[in-house]
Amino acid sequence: MGAVKPPSERVRRKRGKRIQEILTAAAELFGERGYDAVSLEHVAERLDVTKGSLYYYFSSKDELGTAAIETLGDEWTARLEQLLDRTEGTPEARLRALIHEHVTIAVNDYPAALRLFLMPREWPSAQRERIKELRLRHDALFRALIEEGVASGEFTVTSVDTVLQCMHAAMSQAPTWCGELPSAARGKAVDEVADTLLALVHIGQSG
């Protein structure tokens, strides 16, 4: 008998696309309903497939949940890191670009899944700890820019922690505010959110 041939590139791409579809659907459901309220049956219904077909990719809800956390968290933060790598200018210019990109991703790509990271207490302990780690990595991007602006005298804040709490709370609501708007109005709304949040780093400054 001949050796078993490895799967073709086309097969790998198809599998990868299917896994991404499953992870996106699962992340949306976890964000909408909470971890405990979602079953593999719900994910299958969202995708219009059988529950059995999901077991070909994931053996349990815990495995699927972990993969959804890892994929969403890594992809989201990686996109923000890549943005900062190619963005130059003052701390304010870079912070505005970072806020704008974060809100754009939340509104256009992951409107429901964003809540997945806002309520980690609902998750089993292992996934809860991983969510915290991913949030810290994400938070560090904003914190570094705010601290840089404070150190240079460009920003005036009540405290860095308070600014971050207010900023993340507002950004988490952006999908609700902007998501139902038509495309042209949505872009303007995202611009306004970014500009408004910059006021948090100019406390007491005029002009």
Feature locations, PLM:
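C-terminal peripheral helix-coil segments that are non-catalytic and often amphipathic
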Residues: 1-6, 101-108, 139-151, 168-170, ...
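Hydrophobic/aromatic residues within well-ordered alpha-helical segments
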Residues: 18, 61, 72, 76, ...
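Helix-turn-helix
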Residues: 18-21, 29-63, 67
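Short helix-capping/turn signature of helix-turn-helix
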Residues: 55-58, 117-123
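Hydrophobic alpha-helical connector segments
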Residues: 67, 81-111, 163-167, 190
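Amphipathic alpha-helical packing segments from all-alpha helical-bundle domains
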Residues: 74-81, 105-108, 115, 125-151, ...
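Short, hydrophobic secondary-structure boundary micro-motifs
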Residues: 113-118, 158, 179-180
